[in-house]
Curated annotation (Swiss-Prot):
<dbReference type="InterPro" id="IPR007570">
    <property type="entry name" value="Uncharacterised_Ycf23"/>
</dbReference>
<comment type="similarity">
    <text>Belongs to the ycf23 family.</text>
</comment>
<protein>
    <recommendedName>
        <fullName>Uncharacterized protein ycf23</fullName>
    </recommendedName>
</protein>
<dbReference type="GO" id="GO:0009507">
    <property type="term" value="C:chloroplast"/>
</dbReference>
<keyword id="KW-0934">Plastid</keyword>
<keyword id="KW-0150">Chloroplast</keyword>
<dbReference type="Pfam" id="PF04481">
    <property type="entry name" value="DUF561"/>
</dbReference>
Length: 277
């Protein structure tokens, strides 16, 4: 793994990368400004924004934080890099699912080849669709690695099984069960994909301060967060939430033993220290 941006490279090598996603369809400059400011305060690794050159130029004019642009349109990604984007992502497919648009492995690979042709010197991340069966996700991840992709990102969804677990967790007020159930699809993808590729894998979709540590123990090199930040009303609350995620990735709170059982590494928990902003 060799990313061109030194900050990104260092964070992924240390497996502490935090990506804050403003939303692939979020063109609200006021809200994006709040997210950028919160990222700067908390020192998030980078931000993921809509593929709009004007938004990219605006962010680069007010901040030094690395900018990722997400789209499935190669031309839009190319124009965003010309505007200053540091890396691009083919993904964040959630908004397409609601419109009944589902990309196959072959379609994703075709888009990747076009983007690599247009942007041979730009770091590229690809999201692995959660709608694919796990063995299909693994195949796609291996194929993308062979094509020279730099980063992979997982997705997740709420299945019938996880929804039952969520209801159970709410009933008994079990935050750990609730958090891992919210993220179970993304976590299973992280665990499976990270075993077969040497690329950094970003865990996204349903990840919070509890499940972030689980994701790292499962092989993730970074965490992607979106709705939990964007739904907050002010910069301080956004910054506090990002701080929580950074703490979760800075301490190995969970680990996997030789029998592949998850346990809490309580020796690494600090109960006497907190940060106040």
């Amino acid at each position: 793994m060799n990313l061109r941006n030194n900050k990104l490279h260092s964070s992924f090598i240390q497996r502490k990368a935090i990506k804050v996603i403003s939303g692939i369809n979020n063109f609200n400059v006021g809200q994006i400004f709040k997210i950028i400011h919160a990222c700067e305060i908390s020192k998030a690794t980078y931000v993921d924004v809509a593929r709009n050159p004007k938004i990219v130029s605006f962010i680069k004019s007010i901040s030094s934080i690395p900018v990722c642009v997400s789209s499935i349109d190669p031309r839009a990604l190319y124009e965003s890099v010309l505007a200053g984007a540091d890396l691009v992502e083919i993904g964040n497919f959630d908004c397409f699912y609601t419109n009944g648009v589902y990309l196959s492995n072959d379609q994703i690979i075709a888009i990747v080849k076009q983007v690599k042709y247009l942007l041979p010197y730009t770091d590229i991340c690809v999201t692995i669709p959660h709608i694919l069966k796990l063995h299909e996700q693994i195949y796609l991840a291996q194929k993308l690695e062979s094509l020279g992709i730099n980063l992979l990102q997982t997705e997740g969804s709420i299945t019938n099984f996880s929804n039952e677990k969520l209801l159970e967790a709410k009933k008994i007020n079990d935050n750990i069960l609730y958090s891992t159930s919210m993220a179970c699809c993304a976590l299973s993808s992280v665990y499976s994909i990270s075993k077969v590729v040497s690329l950094p894998v970003i865990a996204s979709s349903g990840i919070n301060g509890i499940s972030a540590s689980v994701a790292l123990s499962y092989g993730a090199s970074g965490i992607g967060i979106r709705s939990s930040v964007s739904k907050l009303g002010n910069i301080i609350d956004m910054s506090n939430y990002i701080d929580e995620m950074i703490f979760s990735t800075s301490k190995k709170l969970y680990d996997i033993d030789q029998n592949n059982l998850l346990y809490m590494a309580t020796s690494n928990l600090s109960l006497n220290k907190c940060s106040i902003i």
